[in-house]
């Protein structure tokens, strides 16, 4: 509620979530009737970015001070390891010690449908980084990215078919390697390789070729095999993973 509910409750109900009103109290602004009417339903679609999944554990809520932040009010610690020492899925980024959980996109889409009346949704970002230090050949052979994209697209298709979630578009992040805020050029997210010394020098990566086939429909028959390979590769990692 302190993440999505913070803006979705006003947009759909004209008020902040009850838990926020209870915990934050007078520090949380209130909508008057005119404002509530104005903001309710004032969106055309939702653009959702999905990358990783974290566990949440209780954390004492500190008394407000000059260094207090909005996220402190939630009273939780976010972590990639659960109480059994398990990680949610395959490694997302080694340097950040983060992990991804493909099935999480299924739960998030279903949650938004159930909680907020099945709004129109576009997945505006979904992708995985690889080290910027890799040479051209290493960067182009990005089978890890195929694993990531295929597994998430499989669960996205599944939730659309099973739950009727109103997802109308999906954008893989990103079309080409790019400058990342906070990371600069030290990571690569692209389906295409970009030579930073010559921006006209670009090559489609293996993930880009796979994505082309997927969009054109020629990868549908191999999607199950790709997804199986993704699952097997995650299970073969040394770190202990939680059940999917």
UniProtKB/Swiss-Prot annotation:
Gene3D superfamilies attached to this UniProt entry: Glycosidases
Keyword Glycoprotein applies: yes
A Pfam family of this chain: Glyco_hydro_1
Top-level taxonomic group: Eukaryota
Tissue: In vacuoles called myrosin grains of a certain class of cells, myrosin cells, distributed in the cotyledons and the axis of the embryo as well as in different organs of the growing plant.
Record-level GO BP terms: carbohydrate metabolic process
Glycosylation sites: 32, 216
InterPro entries: Glyco_hydro_1, Glyco_hydro_1_AS, Glycoside_hydrolase_SF
Source organism: Sinapis alba (White mustard)
Subcellular location: Vacuole
Self-association and partners: Homodimer.
Chain's role: Degradation of glucosinolates (glucose residue linked by a thioglucoside bound to an amino acid derivative) to glucose, sulfate and any of the products: thiocyanates, isothiocyanates, nitriles, epithionitriles or oxazolidine-2-thiones.
Protein name as annotated: Myrosinase MB1
Residue numbers annotated as active site: 125 (nucleophile)
GO cellular component, one term: vacuole
SUPFAM superfamilies, alphabetized: (Trans)glycosidases
